[in-house]
Amino acid sequence: MNRRGGQTAFAAIARNERAIAAFIPYSSHLTDTTLITHGADLVRTWRVQGIAFESAEPELVSQRHEQLNGLWRAISCEQVALWIHCIRRKTQAGLDARYENPFCRALDASYNARLNARQAMTNEFYLTLVYRPGHAALGKRAHHGQAEVRRQLLAHVRRMDEIGSLIETTLRSHGENHEQAITVLGCETDSAGRRYSRTLTLLEFLLTGHWQPVRVPAGPVDAYLGSSRILAGAEMMELRSPTCRRYAQFIDFKEYGTHTEPGMLNALLYEDYEYVITHSFSAVGKRQALAYLQRQRAQLANVQDAAYSQIDDLAHAEDALVNGDFVIGEYHFSMMILGADPRQLRRDVSSAMTRIQERGFLATPVTLALDAAFYAQLPANWAYRPRKAMLTSRNFAGLCSFHNFYGGKRDGNPWGPALSLLSTPSGQPFYFNFHHSGLDEDCRGQMMLGNTRIIGQSGSGKTVLLNFLLCQLQKFRSADADGLTTIFFDKDRGAEICIRALDGQYLRIRDGEPTGFNPLQLPCTDRNVMFLDSLLAMLARAHDSPLTSAQHATLATAVRTVLRMPASLRRMSTLLQNITQATSEQRELVRRLGRWCRDDGAGGTGMLWWVFDNPNDCLDFSRPGNYGIDGTAFLDNAETRTPISMYLLHRMNEAMDGRRFVYLMDEAWKWIDDPAFAEFAGDQQLTIRKKNGLGVFSTQMPSSLLGARVAASLVQQCATEIYLPNPRADRAEYLDGFKCTETEYQLIRSMAEDSHLFLVKQGRQAVVAQLDLSGMDDELAILSGNARNLRCFEQALALTRERDPNDWIAVFHRLRREASAGLR
């Protein structure tokens, strides 16, 4: 150091730094939700959820646009100004889950590693109302005592409350959940008694680029905010904190487009870098606004090559202004792009400028007054707003449309945490649940609707999605003392490998092969006796010829006789032996039932004995677990389909005892084509939620599902709908049958078949989500269940002779790789 008036080695750096307190206008918290500035302006901020624009109908988007314009008109006066921030920042996404099953643990770990390879992003909107009492009020403060000042402040706060109430009422329509559509930022106290301000937390982020809780200070706010050193260069700023350095560069509008429409800047919502977009708008008086339009029209009239249409447009704008269709105000825009590397930051700036210019705006990097653009992000910082322009409230509403993405619900669902975390094209995480519940409600333990419909053509990834969700469900086996039971009604064995990897039981019902079913070994309860009466009466029908009352009585007596025997003796053949043949009706009853008995009573074997005349009943859903039933063969056998279905569904009802329960139907149209399944599905759609259960239906044939006798229940009683890509989707099926909107239908058609994308719809909200398991070959082989994998699976079981997945999975993967390499 030079002791004679010299400069330190860091003097040059110090000259580039700013004492930021002078640039921060805030004095203190006046109330929990309101700040007051040194100039007596009042500041209040809300977080706005926004609308899921991807699938919103154009009419809805236009309606919301006009609502915003109407709101800005309603609150416009010289005392009111608005700051709106769109913040795109990195976020930590993930779900804490514990899986007992080794395959589920491995799948979840691989999947999360893939998700984490791409940084999750989130978009947040903040609306700040600035209320300026005006110079007259300031003058009064100077000439009156504290009591008068306090009275004036309370009056201003009440006026701000009135405006805020109108804002909240209007913006609650900008999200399906009305309570969380807009939430005011206030103060909260932690368990140690420390008070934190969410408003100051937002302002600190604008100053530092870091999101961290900020305590309510005892002293002035301006001296408390800003924990980073701010170094301003010619075109870039450095925000230096004790832990890292961040760089920032600004963009603003040099020229505006010829028109605006809602969502003009939506392309920026998909970018993979962090940024803060700031809009401010302060209305001017009608006289000043009209004078501005008249000057613009006069200037155009003096230009020889001016388009007459532009002059006419301004004339119409004058009329609209006078009629109150919009207001005009001073507007400013800035986009602060953040990054850790200056070179990457420049590339991100270039990308942002391209996106903006594609919409007709001329964007330019901010090089003059860079620090002014930085501090103008702070609400009520009037003096620093660069490149102000006059803009209508309708155009302002188009630039700030609060368009966002539906993010699902992470916590507080009926079964606790979200079922799964899915990626989206925007990078924003989507927390998927079968249940649909209010975003701001803690619904844990509530019995709510969770039925789900999955529609996807062959090859669209439907089987993989179903099996993946089945695996993700296994977290609830560990989380609940009552456990979880899933029953998968499968087709073409698509879920067999997966269910066996979960150490579940999988039953293939094939014509002529013993099923392992024996209904007569059910416990002798009133409910079971009634069921057996009904089932056996069906077996004894001949060509839809009903039993006589005498035959019903004979059959009922035999059933009750057999049920009093030890379980090992109860069989269909035993039942037949307990029917007397004193009358022709009784003999006819024996003849009909004989077809279902190993001993048909006439010295032969009944053709259908394999269905129910088995030594032991192997069907048991009483214990929590995963069960699969392949219906490929028996669903096409009209004679055995309904009796088998009746028994399966009766036993399944036993599992719906309050534990978490899910039944899944692949190619549901085929299952519900049977009357027993149709009746069950129709009834359970309405009542299963009361038993803490839900049903998941999938199909590649919408027409068959919509043509089912219970189609109305399957369509109307679904909380969640999933639509996989289908370029050949039939308009009538999707719009009239499934009640999709035109926008949703076009999304379903436009998604590439190999994109791994699908549309998830819950209530009025929808999102394009993605399940991309590329590179997870081992996991996909178990989830996909194709013919080649099934052959390798059967060979692996034969070689290991074990049901334990730990034994056969490794062999399965070896055989699969050998088959791919042409070694087998």
From Swiss-Prot:
Its main location: membrane. GO terms for molecular function: ATP binding. GO terms for cellular component: plasma membrane. Keywords: ATP-binding, Cell membrane, Membrane, Nucleotide-binding. InterPro entries: CagE_TrbE_VirB, CagE_TrbE_VirB_cntrl_dom, P-loop_NTPase, T4SS_component. Pfam families: CagE_TrbE_VirB. It is found in: Cell membrane. Disulfide bonds: none annotated. ATP binds at residues 456-463. PANTHER family: TYPE IV SECRETION SYSTEM PROTEIN CAGE, UNCHARACTERIZED PROTEIN YJGR-RELATED. Belongs to the TrbE/VirB4 family. This is Type IV secretion system protein PtlC homolog. It comes from Bordetella parapertussis (strain 12822 / ATCC BAA-587 / NCTC 13253).
